[in-house]
Amino acid sequence: MHRSTLPKYARVLKRKQFLYISRAGSHCQGSQVIFHVAPSRYSGCCKLGITVSKKFGKAHKRNYFKRIVREAFRKKRHSLPACQIVVMPKNKQQPKFEDLLQDFAQQIPEALSSKLAKNKPTTGVEYSPKNEKCESVLP
C-alpha cells in the first residue's frame, strides 16, 4: 500500500529557512490563510512550511490545520512554480479544504509573479541549503 505523504525535501524545516522566506519573499492573503512566498533556487522543487501559534487554539485544532494545509499543498504542488511557501492562519477559524485548494492555485503564482516583477534585492538572512534533493539549480 502506497502512502501519500509529503517528502522531507518538500518541507521547510529549519528556522533559518522560515526567516529567509518571510524576509526575502512576498506575502499574500488567501481566504483564511496568509502565504509568504519566496522564489526557489531549484527548478521543479516547491517547499512548504507551516506556522501556527498557540493563539489559534488547542493542539488538536493546530494539528488539524496543519494536516489540511499539507494535504492541499500535496495535491497542488506539481502545478505550482518552483517556490518556498510558509503558511499561517489569518484568524482562529479553520479554513475549508476547498478554499485552500483554490488559494494555492491562485494566490501563490500571483505572489511569486509580483515578487519577480518588483525584483527588489533581498536583505536579511541568507539561506544556503546543503543537502537538497532537487536536481537542477537555477542561475
Curated annotation (Swiss-Prot):
Residues 129-139 have a biased composition (Basic and acidic residues). InterPro entries: Ribosomal_Su5_D2-typ_SF (IPR020568), Ribsml_uS5_D2-typ_fold_subgr (IPR014721), RNase_P (IPR000100), RNase_P_CS (IPR020539). Residues 120-139 are annotated as: Disordered. One of its GO terms (cellular component) is ribonuclease P complex. The keyword Mitochondrion does not apply. Keywords: Endonuclease, Hydrolase, Nuclease, RNA-binding, tRNA processing. This is Ribonuclease P protein component. It comes from Chlamydia caviae (strain ATCC VR-813 / DSM 19441 / 03DC25 / GPIC) (Chlamydophila caviae). The gene is rnpA.
